[in-house]
C-alpha cells in the first residue's frame, strides 16, 4: 500500500537540514577551518597593528631655546658654487672671509652639471651653492646632513633638540643661509647686517599635551575588521549556489522541502557559528590593546550583528547567481568595496553627517561607522560602554539598530528574490505575488477532468495508441493533454515538445523512449514542476503542474530520480538516505528501518559508510534511485535510472521497481530497449517532441516489429544454401540477417507464425544440414524503435535545454545500405607503403604541427607563460623607473612664507596658521607690521610668554630692540620641518626691506642625490637575475609536458598502436619546445641586459653565456620530458613541476649567494654540485658568474675568485646532461611507453627482444566448460602449428595476471590478487569476438595487456602473425586499431585535424588522406562536425570519431572497448552497423568488450563471458542461449471481451502444454509465463499447440521467445561474488563503474 500524502512540519525539516549543514561543515574542513581562522587571524593581526602603532600621547612641553648660531658647525666645509661671475664671486668672498673666516673653503664650478659631477666624488662635508640670480640661490647639502623629506609637517614623536626641524640650526644650514643673505644685503645696500643675523636666536615652541592619532593604522584596523567576517558569507554563498548549481535545492523542494526550512537551517547554523566567533573575538579584543577600555558585551553585539548581517547579505546575493565560482568572489569584492566606502565616510571630516546614515542599509558601512565610534571613545580613555551608547557624533545605539534592521532586510530580500528571479529550473512567482489573496489562501481548487478521448483529441487511437484494459479505466494518474514546450536558442525558437497527449495509469510502469533530444527529460521536468509548459495541460491526480500551489500538493506524492545524481558529496550513503527520508516526512521512528530496507533492496550495505563523492557512477545512480523510492511515494519519476550501471545492478533496480509497482505510478526514461521491454508495461515512444506510439511490448512488436529471429548454431560442414532454401520453402518471406562460420540468423515475419511449426519440424528431420541447435526469439524493442525513427522527420534540431546534455547528432536520411557501401570502401583502404625514414620524417612534422596547435589553443598554458613573462617584464620596468625616479625623489623646496603661514583673509588650512608676533621692545613695531603686510603674511599679536596657550601655531617671532635694529628670536613648531629656514628667510628679507630694497631674497633647499651606488646596482642585478631564473624555470612544464596529458587521456597509447615511432614523437615535440624556450629566454635575457647598462660585455665571457644557453635549453626540455612520466602519481603535473622548478631555482640561488659571504670554497662546492645535479641551475649559475665578472669598474686583478672557474662548469654540464637525458628518456620510454608496433630507427633498445615470460601449464580445472577447454586446446594446437593455412589475427595463450595487494602491509604479509586466470582464446580474421563480464571480471586487464599498458605475469599474446614479445620485424602488421573506453581525443583539436594526425602517423599520403576523410565523413555522418573542436562535440560523435580513428589504415587487429558508450539507440544502431560492415572483408579481426548484451548480440560472431578472471563460456550467441538459457518466455494478449472463466481455462491449457510453466505478474488482458527449457522438447510442437490454443481461445496475439543473452549473463555472473571472497580474485568490482564517471550516458 502506498504511503499517504506526506505533510512534514517546517521545524522538523529545519532540524534535519541543520544536521546536514553541520555535517557538511565538519567534512569540508578546508573551508570550515578558513571560516574560523581567518577572522582570528585578522583579529590578531589588528591587535599587532594596534600594538605597533599605538596612539601617541605627548605630555606638555615648555619652550626650548637652542644654542646660539655657531659658525663652527660648518667647520672644514668645502663650499662649491656656480656660476662664477663677479657678483657671485663677491658674495662668496664675503661669506668665506668676512662672515665665516677659517671655517670654509670655496671652489668655483662653471655650471651646475660640473658641480653635481664633483659631488659624486666628494665627502659629505661638500656643500653646493647655485645662484639663479643675484637675489635667489639654492643650497645643496648631502641628504645625510639635512632632512630630505618632501612632507612639510612631521610627527612630535621623539622630537627634541635633534628633531628634523632643529637640524637646520645645528648642522649649519641656517648659518650658511644667514651668511649668504647678509652678503647679498651688503652687496645691495653696502650695509652689513651680519651681526644682527648672527644674533638671531632659535627657540623650539612649547606644545600642549596631546593624543596624536595615526590615520593609516586606524584605516587598516577599520577595513580589516570589515573583511574579517567575509569568509562566512563567502563560503555560505558558495555552498548555497553549489547546491542550486547541482539542482539539489529544486529536487529537495520536489521531495517536499519548505523554503522556510531551507533558509532557516543556514541562518541558524551560521548564527550559532558567528555567535561563538563574535564572543571569542570580543573577549580577545577587549583583553588586548585593540579595545581595552570597552565593554566586551558592547563589542560582542557589534561583532555579532555585523557577522549576521554580512552572512544575510551573502544570502541575498545567492538568487542572483547560477555559478558557485562567481558568487564567492563577488561577495568578497562587494564587501571590500562597501568597506572602503564606509572608510571614506569616516576619514573625510567634511563629509555631511546628514548623508552618513543614508549608507546604513550597507551593513559594511554601518559597522565601520560603529567601530570608528568605538575607536573614538577609546582615544579619550572612555571606551564603548552601555553608558555612552547614545553619545558622540555617530551614536553606537544607531549602528546596533541599523545592523539588526539590515539583517532582517537582507533575509526578506533573499527569500523574495529566490521566488521571483527566473532560474534554470523551478516555477517562478510574479513580482507582487505576496499581495495576491491566493498566496495567503490555501483553498484547493477543483478542475474538470478530461476524458481520454478529449485528451488525445485528434489522435487515432487505433493507429498508435493501444487501448488499455477495462481494469485501468478510471485509474488515470497522470494526464497529459496538448503539452508544448518551446524555448529560445540564440536566435531561433526550438520546440522541445509538440502537442504531446497521453495518459499514465496507476499500477503500471510506463517507459518513455526516444533518442537524445526528443523531449523525454523535458516532459519529466514539467511533470515534477521544474519547468512550466509553454502550452497545454498536465495533471497529477487532479493537481495541475502549472499551478505552483497545486504542484506543492502533487510533490508530496512524488519520488524523483533526475538525470543528475541527487546527493550531498561529503555525506555517506546512509546519511544521505536518512536526511532525505526525514525531509520527505517519514516518521522518525521508521527512518532507520526504511533506510536499511532501501540499502538491502539495492545491495548497498557494503558502501553505506562511503561518502557520495567517492562512489562510482553506477553507485551514485543506485543512491539516487534509493532516494527516489524512500517512503514508498505514490508516483516515481525516474530519468534514466540505470545509466552507468552494470547489468547486475540494473537487474537489482528492475526487481525493486517491479516489486513496488502495485497501486503506484512509475514513469522512467531509458536508452536501453531491453530495459523497457522487460520492465515497462506500457512504452511511449517520443520523436521530435511528438508521440509516435503508446502500448505494451507485444502491441509494439506485432505492429512495428520485423517478426521473429531464428538463430542457428551450425557446424563447419553446414550446407548454408540448402538450409536457406529449406527455410524459404516453408516461409518464403524469410530473410537472412547474419551469417558467419558458426551461426545463421533469419527473420521470420509475424504473419507466418502458423507456418513456424512446419519449419521447425523440417529442421528437426533434416539434421544432416549441419544445424547443431536452433532457437527463436521475438523481435526486440530496438527494432521497433528503429523502424519508428526511420519514418520520423529528422530535418531539424530537436532537443531540450532542460536535459543539460549535448545533442546527439542525427544521421541523415540516407539508407543504411549506402552507409554499408561507404564502409566497405573504407575497409579496403590501406596505409601507404613508405620507407621507415620517410615515415619518420612525416611523423616528426605531424607531431610538431599537432603540438604547436595544442599549445596555441590550450589557453591555460599560454596564459601561464605569458603571465610569467609579464611579471618579469613588469618587475624590470618597475625597477628601472624606481632607479631613475629615485634621483628625483626629493623635489627642491622653496623656503618661502607660503609654506606655513596664511595670507591675510585666508582661513586656517591643515598646518598653515598665522604668524605669532611678540613685541618685546617696549615700543611700537609698526614698521615690522608693515613689512609683514608687504610680504602677504597674516600676523597675530601675542603678549604672553607661554606659547602653549596660543597653540597650535606654526611659528612665532619675538622682536627685541638692539643697538642698530631689531634682533629676533625665531620660535618654531618642531613638527614644521622647514619652519626655521623659512623664518630665517623672513628675517633676512625684513632687514632688506628696512634698508629700502623692495626685492626679496629667495632660497631653495635642493639636496644632492647621488647616482645609485655600485653595491645597490649589484644587488638589484642579482635580484633580477635570480628572478629570471625562478620565472624562466617555471615555464617549460607548461609547454613541454604535453606527454603527461597524452598519457592521461591514453592518446599516446593510441598513437603508438597506430604505428608512431617513439623517437619521432619526442623529436616532433622538441622541434616546437626548444625554439619556443629559446625565444622566451632570449627575450628575458635581452630585457635584463637592456635595462642594465652597467655591465661590460667581455666577449669571451659573453660567449660563455651563449654557449651555455645553446645546451641549457634542450637540456631543460629533455629533463621536462622525463619528469612528465610522473603523470601516474601527480594529478596536476604541469602546475606541480612548475612549482618544483621555481622553488628549486630559488633554493639554489639562496644557498649559493648566502654562502658567498662565508667563504669562496663553500660557494664553489655548492655551485659545482648544483650544476651537476640540478639541470635547471647551470644557466642561472653562469649568468650570476658573468654578472660578477662584468662590472664596468671592477678591478682588473681580483683575488677573491676567478669567474672563469665557475663559468666553465656551468657551460660544460648542460652538454653532458643532454646526452644523459636522451638515454634516460629512451629508458623511460621503454618502461612506461607501452608497445611499439613499428621498429624505431633511433630508439633501438625499444625493439630488442623482451625478457621471456614464464609459460607454465595452467592448473587442471575439472569444472571448466567444455567449450572453453576446446578453445584452449585449439590455441595450443595453433601455437605449435608451423604450416597452418591461416593463423588467427589475435591469439591469447594462458594469459595470467596477478597484482600485489597492499592491504596486508601492517601484517607483514604480501598477498596477491588474480586479475586473469590462464585465459586462452583466439579471434579469426573476419571475426568479431565479444568479451563480456561483470565488474572486476578481468576484461580491462585483457585489453590493457593486448595494447601493452600492462605486462602479463605469464602467458603469451600473438597479434597478426607474430607474438607480442617477438623481435621479428614482420611487415604484416603496421598498426593496430584501438577504440578505448575513454575517448583519447585532444579537446582543442578539430575532427579533421585528428584524422590528419592519425592518417599521417599511419603513413598515408596527403592525397589518400583527403579521400579517406571524405569517405569516413560520408559513412559516419561526420561532415558537419569536421571543423568543430572535440570539446564542443556530443558524446556520440566522439565515439564515432574514436571508432573511425581505430579503422584508419586498414589495421589487421582492432580492439573495441565499449565503442557505443554514451550513444542513444539510433546512434548505437548506426555504430553497430558500421562495425559489422567494416569487418566483412575477412582480412581483419576485432575484440569487443561491452556491458550491453544487445550490442554483443547485434555485432559479435562469438561471445566469451568472463567471471572472476576466468572464461566461463565461449561460443555463438545462439549456442550460449541453448546451452545456458533457463527456458522460454510466453506472453499472451487476450481480447477485451474475454471472461475470467475463459482465462482460467486458458491458463489450464498452458499448464497442459508446458507442465512446469509459472505465471508471471500480469494483467487481465495480458498473461505472461516463464517456461522451463525442459518443457520445450520441440519448438515445432510448441508452436503447433500454441497456434491451436490461439484458434480455440480468445487470444489476439502471442509471443514465444528464447531466453535472452542478458538472462544468460546474469545467471553466469551470480557466482563471482562468492568466488571473489574465497579464491582471492581481484576484487575490483567497482572498476567498471568508476570508469563510467567519465562517460556521458544519455
From Swiss-Prot:
The keyword Ion transport does not apply. N-glycosylated. Disruption phenotype: Mice display hypothyroidism and lethal heart abnormalities that may be due to altered autolysosomes processing. It is found in: Golgi apparatus membrane; Lysosome membrane; Late endosome membrane; Cell membrane. ATP 2 binds at residues 1333-1340. It comes from the Eukaryota. Its EC number is 7.6.2.-. InterPro entries: AAA+_ATPase, ABC2_TM, ABC_transporter-like_ATP-bd, ABC_transporter-like_CS, ABCA, P-loop_NTPase, R2_ABCA1-4-like. The chain crosses the membrane at residues 32-52, 220-240, 264-284, 297-317, 328-348, 355-375, 396-416, 864-884, 967-987, 1021-1041, 1071-1091, 1102-1122, 1138-1158, 1164-1184, 1207-1227. Induction: Down-regulated by digoxin. Up-regulated by an excess cellular cholesterol level. Up-regulated when ABCA1 is down-regulated. Expressed in cardiomyocytes, oligodendrocytes and astrocytes in brain, alveolar type 2 cells in lung and follicular cells in the thyroid gland (at protein level). Detected in brain, testis, lung, heart, liver, kidney, skeletal muscle and placenta. Strongly expressed in the basal cells of the seminiferous tubules, interstitial cells consisting of Leydig cells, as well as the tunica albuginea. GO terms for cellular component: Golgi membrane; late endosome; late endosome membrane; lysosomal membrane; lysosome; plasma membrane. GO terms for molecular function: ABC-type transporter activity; ATP binding; ATP hydrolysis activity. It holds the Pfam family R1_ABCA1. Its main location: Golgi. Keywords: ATP-binding, Cell membrane, Endosome, Glycoprotein, Golgi apparatus, Lipid transport, Lysosome, Membrane, Nucleotide-binding, Repeat, Translocase, Transmembrane, Transmembrane helix, Transport. It is a multi-pass membrane protein. Glycans are attached at residues 86, 388, 458, 919, 996. ATP 1 binds at residues 514-521. Belongs to the ABC transporter superfamily. ABCA family. Cholesterol efflux transporter in macrophages that is responsible for APOAI/high-density lipoproteins (HDL) formation at the plasma membrane under high cholesterol levels and participates in reverse cholesterol transport. May play a role in the processing of autolysosomes. This is Cholesterol transporter ABCA5. It comes from Mus musculus (Mouse).
Amino acid at each position: 500500500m502506498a504511503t499517504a500524502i506526506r505533510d512534514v512540519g517546517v521545524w522538523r525539516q529545519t532540524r534535519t537540514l541543520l544536521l546536514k549543514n553541520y555535517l557538511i561543515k565538519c567534512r569540508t574542513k578546508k573551508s570550515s577551518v578558513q571560516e574560523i581562522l581567518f577572522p582570528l587571524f585578522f583579529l590578531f593581526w589588528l591587535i599587532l597593528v594596534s600594538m605597533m602603532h599605538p596612539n601617541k600621547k605627548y605630555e606638555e612641553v615648555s619652550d626650548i631655546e637652542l644654542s646660539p648660531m655657531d659658525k663652527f658647525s660648518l667647520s672644514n666645509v668645502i663650499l662649491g658654487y656656480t656660476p662664477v661671475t663677479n657678483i657671485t664671486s663677491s658674495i662668496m668672498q664675503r661669506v668665506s672671509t668676512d662672515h665665516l673666516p677659517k671655517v670654509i673653503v670655496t671652489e668655483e664650478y662653471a655650471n651646475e652639471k660640473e658641480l653635481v659631477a664633483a659631488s659624486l666624488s666628494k665627502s659629505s662635508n661638500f656643500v653646493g651653492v647655485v645662484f639663479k640670480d643675484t637675489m635667489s640661490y639654492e643650497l645643496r647639502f648631502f641628504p645625510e646632513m639635512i632632512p630630505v623629506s618632501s612632507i612639510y609637517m612631521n610627527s612630535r614623536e621623539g622630537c627634541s633638540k635633534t628633531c628634523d626641524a632643529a637640524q637646520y640650526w645645528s648642522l649649519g644650514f641656517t648659518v650658511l643661509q644667514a651668511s649668504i643673505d647678509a652678503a647679498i644685503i651688503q652687496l645691495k645696500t653696502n650695509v652689513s647686517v651680519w651681526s644682527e643675523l648672527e644674533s638671531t636666536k632659535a627657540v623650539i615652541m612649547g606644545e600642549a599635551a596631546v593624543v596624536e592619532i595615526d590615520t593609516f593604522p586606524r584605516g587598516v584596523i577599520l577595513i580589516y575588521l570589515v573583511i574579517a567576517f567575509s569568509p562566512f558569507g563567502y563560503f555560505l554563498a558558495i555552498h548555497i549556489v553549489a547546491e542550486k548549481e547541482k539542482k539539489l535545492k529544486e529536487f529537495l523542494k520536489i521531495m517536499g522541502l519548505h523554503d522556510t526550512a531551507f533558509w532557516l537551517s543556514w541562518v541558524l547554523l551560521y548564527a550559532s557559528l558567528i555567535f561563538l566567533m563574535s564572543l571569542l573575538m570580543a573577549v580577545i579584543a577587549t583583553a588586548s590593546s585593540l579595545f581595552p577600555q570597552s565593554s566586551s558585551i558592547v563589542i560582542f553585539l557589534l561583532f555579532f550583528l555585523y557577522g549576521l548581517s554580512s552572512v544575510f547579505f551573502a544570502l541575498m546575493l545567492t538568487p542572483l547567481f547560477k555559478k558557485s565560482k562567481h558568487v564567492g568572489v563577488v561577495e568578497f569584492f562587494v564587501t571590500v568595496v562597501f568597506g572602503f566606502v564606509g572608510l571614506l565616510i569616516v576619514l573625510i571630516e567634511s563629509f555631511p553627517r546628514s548623508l552618513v546614515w543614508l549608507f546604513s542599509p550597507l551593513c559594511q558601512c554601518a559597522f565601520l561607522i560603529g567601530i570608528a565610534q568605538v575607536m573614538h571613545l577609546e582615544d579619550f580613555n572612555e571606551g564603548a560602554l552601555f553608558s555612552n551608547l547614545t553619545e558622540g557624533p555617530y551614536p553606537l545605539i544607531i549602528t546596533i539598530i541599523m545592523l539588526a534592521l539590515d539583517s532582517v532586510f537582507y533575509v526578506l530580500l533573499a527569500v523574495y528574490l529566490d521566488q521571483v528571479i527566473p532560474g534554470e529550473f523551478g516555477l517562478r512567482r510574479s513580482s507582487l505575488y505576496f499581495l495576491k489573496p491566493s498566496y495567503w489562501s490555501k483553498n484547493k481548487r477543483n478542475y474538470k477532468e478530461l476524458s481520454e478521448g478529449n485528451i488525445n483529441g485528434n489522435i487515432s487511437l487505433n493507429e498508435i495508441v493501444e487501448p488499455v484494459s477495462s481494469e485501468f479505466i478510471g485509474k488515470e494518474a497522470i494526464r497529459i493533454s496538448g503539452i508544448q514546450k518551446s524555448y529560445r536558442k540564440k536566435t531561433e525558437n526550438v520546440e522541445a515538445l509538440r502537442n504531446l497527449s497521453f495518459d499514465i495509469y496507476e499500477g503500471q510502469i510506463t517507459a518513455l523512449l526516444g533518442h537524445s533530444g526528443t523531449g523525454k527529460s523535458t516532459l519529466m521536468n514539467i511533470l515534477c514542476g521544474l519547468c512550466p509548459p509553454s502550452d497545454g495541460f498536465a495533471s497529477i491526480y487532479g493537481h495541475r503542474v502549472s499551478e505552483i500551489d497545486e504542484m506543492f500538493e502533487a510533490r508530496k506524492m512524488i519520488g524523483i530520480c533526475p538525470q543528475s545524481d541527487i546527493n550531498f558529496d561529503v555525506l555517506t550513503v546512509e546519511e544521505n538516505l536518512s536526511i532525505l527520508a526525514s525531509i520527505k516526512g517519514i516518521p522518525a521512528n521508521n527512518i532507520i528501518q526504511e533506510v536499511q530496507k532501501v540499502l538491502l533492496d539495492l545491495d548497498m550495505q557494503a558502501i553505506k559508510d562511503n561518502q557520495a563523492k567517492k562512489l562510482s557512477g553506477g553507485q551514485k545512480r543506485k543512491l539516487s534511485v534509493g532516494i527516489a523510492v524512500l517512503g514508498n511515494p505514490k508516483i516515481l519519476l525516474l530519468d534514466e535510472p540505470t545509466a552507468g550501471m552494470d547489468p547486475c545492478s540494473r537487474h537489482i533496480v528492475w526487481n525493486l521497481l517491479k516489486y513496488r509497482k502495485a497501486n503506484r505510478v512509475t514513469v522512467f526514461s531509458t536508452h536501453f530497449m531491453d530495459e523497457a521491454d522487460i520492465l515497462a508495461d506500457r512504452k511511449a515512444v517520443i520523436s521530435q517532441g511528438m508521440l509516435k506510439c503508446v502500448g505494451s511490448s507485444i502491441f509494439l512488436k506485432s505492429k512495428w516489429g520485423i517478426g521473429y529471429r531464428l538463430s542457428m548454431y551450425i557446424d563447419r560442414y553446414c550446407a548454408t544454401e540448402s538450409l536457406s532454401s529449406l527455410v524459404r520453402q516453408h516461409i518464403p518471406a524469410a530473410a537472412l540477417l547474419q551469417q558467419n562460420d558458426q551461426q545463421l540468423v533469419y527473420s521470420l515475419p509475424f504473419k507466418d507464425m502458423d507456418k513456424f511449426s512446419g519449419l521447425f519440424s523440417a529442421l528437426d528431420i533434416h539434421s544432416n544440414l549441419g544445424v547443431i541447435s536452433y532457437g527463436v526469439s521475438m523481435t526486440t524493442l530496438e527494432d521497433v524503435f528503429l523502424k519508428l525513427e526511420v519514418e520520423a522527420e529528422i530535418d531539424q534540431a530537436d532537443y531540450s535545454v532542460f536535459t543539460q546534455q549535448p545533442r546527439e547528432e542525427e544521421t541523415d536520411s540516407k539508407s543504411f545500405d549506402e552507409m554499408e557501401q561507404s564502409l566497405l570502401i573504407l575497409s579496403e583502404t590501406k596505409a601507404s607503403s613508405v620507407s621507415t625514414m620517410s615515415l619518420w620524417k612525416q611523423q616528426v612534422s605531424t607531431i610538431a604541427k599537432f603540438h604547436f596547435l595544442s599549445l596555441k589553443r590550450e589557453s591555460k598554458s599560454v596564459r601561464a607563460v605569458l603571465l610569467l613573462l609579464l611579471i618579469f617584464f613588469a618587475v624590470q620596468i618597475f625597477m628601472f623607473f624606481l632607479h631613475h625616479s629615485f634621483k628625483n625623489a626629493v623635489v627642491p623646496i622653496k623656503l618661502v612664507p607660503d609654506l606655513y603661514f596664511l595670507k591675510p583673509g585666508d582661513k586656517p588650512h591643515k598646518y598653515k596658521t598665522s604668524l605669532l608676533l611678540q613685541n618685546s621692545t617696549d615700543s611700537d613695531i609698526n614698521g615690522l607690521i608693515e613689512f609683514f603686510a608687504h610680504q602677504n603674511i597674516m600676523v597675530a599679536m601675542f603678549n604672553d610668554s607661554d606659547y602653549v596657550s596660543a597653540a597650535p601655531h606654526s611659528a612665532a617671532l619675538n622682536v627685541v630692540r638692539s643697538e642698530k635694529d631689531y634682533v629676533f628670536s625665531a620660535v618654531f613648531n618642531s613638527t614644521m620641518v622647514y619652519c626655521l629656514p623659512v623664518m630665517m628667510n623672513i628675517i633676512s628679507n625684513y632687514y632688506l626691506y628696512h634698508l629700502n630694497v623692495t626685492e626679496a631674497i629667495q632660497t631653495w633647499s635642493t639636496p644632492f642625490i647621488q647616482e645609485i651606488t655600485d653595491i645597490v646596482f649589484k644587488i638589484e642585478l642579482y635580484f633580477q637575475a635570480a628572478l629570471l631564473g625562478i620565472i624562466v624555470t617555471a615555464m617549460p612544464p607548461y609547454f613541454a609536458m604535453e606527454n603527461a596529458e597524452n598519457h592521461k587521456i591514453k592518446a599516446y597509447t593510441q598513437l603508438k598502436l597506430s604505428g608512431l615511432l617513439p623517437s619521432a614523437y619526442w623529436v616532433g615535440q622538441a622541434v616546437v619546445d626548444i625554439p619556443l624556450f629559446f625565444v622566451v629566454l632570449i627575450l628575458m635575457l635581452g630585457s635584463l641586459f637592456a635595462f642594465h647598462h652597467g655591465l661590460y660585455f667581455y666577449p669571451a665571457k659573453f660567449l660563455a653565456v651563449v654557449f651555455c644557453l645553446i645546451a641549457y635549453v634542450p637540456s631543460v626540455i629533455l629533463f621536462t620530458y622525463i619528469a612528465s612520466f610522473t603523470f601516474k602519481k601527480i594529478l596536476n603535473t604541469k602546475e606541480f613541476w612548475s612549482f618544483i622548478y621555481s622553488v628549486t631555482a630559488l633554493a639554489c640561488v639562496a644557498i649559493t649567494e648566502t654562502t658567498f659571504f662565508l667563504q669562496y670554497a663553500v660557494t664553489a662546492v655548492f655551485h659545482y654540485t648544483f650544476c651537476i645535479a640540478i639541470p635547471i641551475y647551470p644557466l642561472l649559475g653562469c649568468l650570476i658568474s658573468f654578472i660578477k665578472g662584468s662590472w664596468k669598474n671592477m678591478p682588473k686583478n681580483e683575488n677573491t675568485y676567478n669567474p672563469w672557474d665557475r663559468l666553465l662548469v656551468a657551460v660544460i654540464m648542460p652538454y653532458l646532461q643532454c646526452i644523459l637525458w636522451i638515454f634516460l628518456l629512451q629508458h623511460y620510454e621503454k618502461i612506461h611507453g607501452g608497445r611499439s608496433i613499428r621498429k624505431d630507427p633511433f630508439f633501438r633498445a625499444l625493439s630488442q627482444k623482451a625478457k621471456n615470460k614464464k609459460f607454465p601449464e595452467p592448473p587442471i580445472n575439472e569444472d571448466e566448460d567444455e567449450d572453453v577447454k576446446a578453445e584452449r586446446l585449439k590455441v595450443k594446437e595453433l601455437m605449435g602449428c608451423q604450416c597452418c593455412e591461416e593463423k588467427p589475427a589475435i591469439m591469447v595463450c594462458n594469459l595470467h595476471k596477478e597484482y600485489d595487494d597492499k592491504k596486508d602491509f601492517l601484517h607483514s604479509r604480501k598477498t596477491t590478487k588474480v586479475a586473469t586466470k590462464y585465459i586462452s582464446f583466439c579471434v579469426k580474421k573476419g571475426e568479431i569476438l565479444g568479451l563480456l563480464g561483470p565488474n572486476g571480471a578481468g576484461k580491462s586487464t585483457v585489453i590493457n595487456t593486448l595494447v601493452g599498458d600492462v605486462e602479463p605475469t605469464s602467458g603469451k599474446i600473438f597479434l597478426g602473425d607474430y607474438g607480442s614479445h617477438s623481435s621479428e620485424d614482420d611487415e604484416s602488421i603496421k598498426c593496430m586499431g584501438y577504440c578505448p573506453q575513454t575517448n583519447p581525443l585532444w579537446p582543442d583539436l578539430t575532427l579533421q585535424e585528428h584524422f590528419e594526425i592519425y592518417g599521417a602517423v599511419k603513413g598515408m599520403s596527403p592525397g589518400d588522406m583527403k579521400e579517406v576523410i571524405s569517405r569516413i565523413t560520408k559513412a559516419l555522418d561526420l561532415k558537419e562536425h569536421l571543423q568543430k573542436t572535440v570539446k564542443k562535440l556530443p558524446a556520440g560523435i566522439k565515439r564515432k570519431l574514436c571508432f573511425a580513428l581505430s579503422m584508419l589504415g586498414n589495421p589487421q587487429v582492432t580492439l573495441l572497448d565499449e565503442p557505443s558508450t554514451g550513444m542513444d539507440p539510433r546512434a548505437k544502431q548506426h555504430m553497430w552497423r558500421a562495425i559489422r560492415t567494416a569487418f566483412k572483408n575477412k582480412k581483419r579481426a576485432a575484440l569487443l568488450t561491452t556491458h550491453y548484451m544487445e550490442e554483443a548480440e547485434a555485432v559479435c560472431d562469438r561471445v566469451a563471458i568472463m567471471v572472476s578472471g576466468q572464461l566461463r563460456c565461449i561460443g555463438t550467441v545462439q549456442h550460449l542461449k541453448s546451452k545456458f538459457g533457463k527456458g522460454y518466455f510466453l506472453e499472451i494478449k487476450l481480447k477485451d471481451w474475454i471472461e475470467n472463466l475463459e482465462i482460467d481455462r486458458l491458463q489450464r491449457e498452458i499448464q497442459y502444454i508446458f507442465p512446469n510453466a509459472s505465471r508471471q505478474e500480469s494483467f487481465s488482458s495480458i498473461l505472461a509465463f516463464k517456461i522451463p527449457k525442459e518443457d520445450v522438447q520441440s519448438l515445432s510442437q510448441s508452436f503447433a499447440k500454441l497456434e491451436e490454443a490461439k484458434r480455440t481461445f480468445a487470444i489476439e496475439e502471442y509471443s514465444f521467445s528464447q531466453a535472452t543473452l542478458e538472462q544468460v549473463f546474469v545467471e553466469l555472473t551470480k557466482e563471482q561474488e562468492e568466488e571473489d571472497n574465497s579464491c582471492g580474485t581481484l576484487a575490483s568490482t567497482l572498476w567498471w563503474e568508476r570508469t563510467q564517471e567519465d562517460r556521458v550516458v544519455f
